[in-house]
Regions:
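A conserved ligand/cofactor-binding region detector
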Residues: 1-291
């Protein structure tokens, strides 16, 4: 494995001492992604699909450095250059994909399954603004969008895309992935995050209030959008169906790639439904299999 300082010099033609904390963060993110890209995927005939509306995965930089077994090494390299790893960790935005115990449970499962070397992946949605970000203005609490996705992020784009049919329109998805590294393992799994193609941030009005009727443009804006009215209720259902349809189509495609004739699908896939949000995957799988 190339030393981080050598990686930085090769990619930037600068030393660690010459870079700002943010520049070091970007280099460290790319360094970790390069290492994880070389790791093979866990494989097996049968695969677990852990479908969840949320994944509270925490900050990924420190977690990935620990799982790769290089945390102390990086800390020492940075200290030698007069830099603080803890300051750089503060720059790393936490993916705003979860809220509480449900999301933390899901994250613990996909973390553990990767460490155990199981062929098992999470499937969810890529919420661009999360639940909300709490800020204080003039001694008052306000909720604002938590725009956590930066130009340089842990998301890995793919070419995978599916058509999800609704009553009056069809949405085309796109899939981004996050590498889930097991603790000191030479293999990895993925967290699969589905998204819409035409997200529109301009639908956000004040705080976290937004136009909930434009489903084609708002579906993956927020985690758990306000469902106190009819439009909010419908948006939640649209989100859940979009998630499970993509998950089911991914499951079927991957099972076929591994040799399934679909009559033996149970020998190729397990589905873990995390709470009620993904429960529509059952009728959706039946719909797809009877087409």
């Amino acid at each position: 494995m190339t030393q981080f300082s050598t990686f930085v010099q090769t990619t930037t033609h600068k030393t660690l001492e010459q870079l700002s904390d943010r520049e070091i963060y970007v280099q460290l993110l790319n360094y970790v992604k390069e290492i994880s890209a070389d790791k093979p995927k866990n494989t097996a005939k049968r695969k677990v699909y852990y479908i969840s509306a949320e994944f509270l995965i925490g900050k990924l930089l420190s977690n990935n450095l620990i799982n790769l077994g290089i945390y102390q090494e990086i800390k020492a390299e940075l200290a030698k250059a007069g830099k603080s790893l803890s300051h750089i960790e503060d720059i790393d935005p936490e993916p705003s994909l979860g809220n509480g115990g449900l999301g933390r449970l899901a994250s613990c499962f996909i973390d553990s399954m990767s460490t155990l070397g199981l062929n098992a992946e999470g499937v969810g949605l890529n919420y661009h603004c999360g639940l909300f970000k709490q800020v204080f203005k003039k001694n008052e609490q306000h909720a604002e969008p938590n725009n956590w996705i930066e130009e340089n992020s842990w998301l890995i784009p793919t070419e995978i895309s599916y058509e999800v049919p609704f009553k009056h329109f069809t949405l085309t998805s796109k899939l981004d992935r996050v590498d889930i590294l097991g603790y000191k393992k030479e293999s990895k799994n993925y967290l699969n995050l589905f998204d819409i193609q035409a997200l529109n941030y301009n639908l956000i009005e004040t705080g976290i209030e937004f136009n909930k009727t434009k489903i084609k443009e708002n579906l993956t804006l927020f985690l758990y959008p306000d469902d106190s009215d009819k439009n909010g209720e419908l948006l939640r259902i649209y989100q859940q169906y979009f998630m499970v349809s993509n998950a089911a189509q991914l499951l079927i495609d991957e099972a076929i790639e591994r040799g399934s004739n679909l009559h033996d699908l149970a020998d190729y896939a397990y589905v873990q439904i995390n709470d009620t949000h993904p429960s529509m995957v059952i009728p959706e799988l039946i719909r797809l299999l009877t087409k």
